Amino acid sequence: MPEERTRLLAEELNGLGELTFLHPPGTFALTPASVTALHAIAQSQNLLSGSGLDWGTGVGCLAIAACRIPSVTCVTGLEISVANVVSAQENARLNGVAEKIEFVEADSYQPTSTERKNHMASLRGKIDFLIANPPSSEADDGFGYRRAVLRGACEFLRDGAVVFLSVSFQYGPERVRDLCARFPQFSFRRVLAASAWAPFDLARPDLLACLKLYAEEEGKGGTPYVFPDRKNDRTFLNARTALARFFETGESPLTKWQSLLFDFRSHAGD
């Protein structure tokens, strides 16, 4: 059973102070991708001010970190799991930012209650920043939730807003380019934060399922995934090769957890 509490020290968070997150059984524990997204917020505080959205907030860690920034006035965290919402509310109180956060039970951008629908309606065109660390989606190439994040965000972001979006290295630059081609209001600017090379740990059933999905996508002619070759640092493996090597050697491929910066223009091309 995972630990029920994660503590991040002040020295990790560039002036945001120490943060503690409770994640009891049945809620989302922090992952390496979560920690990288937290580092992006801590290292790029100057980009965040005003009102924000946290898509798929889980137990609230990214929204809470953003609310520690003095220039951030409020954040709305969107989360489909009731258990996660309850823990997120407790974490906001624990970390002293409850007055700056609203947590909304929602399926993507769609709240489950009329009251919360009215709250979301009041945010249209007024959001200054969006942060999102989506999971891998199922029944597609794993990138579907990231497309959903940007598709739905257009309704809420003001012109000039910024997006911090978690996109792990293995998805490759071609998918990022395609994301901006599909949604031309968004422009990719740079990588805000990245972990060191780390195992895409196939001892985790969820990551093994992801790699199998990636291999199936490549088999259907989809865009190849990108994993560095442990045997030759100048070459890369696609998902099918990485999966075959894992079954042969038991060795997980490598990746980096990353947070990417996009900006938003309501009229593409401005």
For each feature predicted by the language model, list its residue ranges:
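Conserved SAM/SAH cofactor-binding pocket of Class I
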Residues: 33-122, 129-132, 137-138
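Class I S-adenosyl-L-methionine
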Residues: 170-178, 182-261
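Conserved beta strand-loop-helix elements of the APE1-like EEP
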Residues: 260-268
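Glycine/threonine-rich flexible loop motifs
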Residues: 140-144
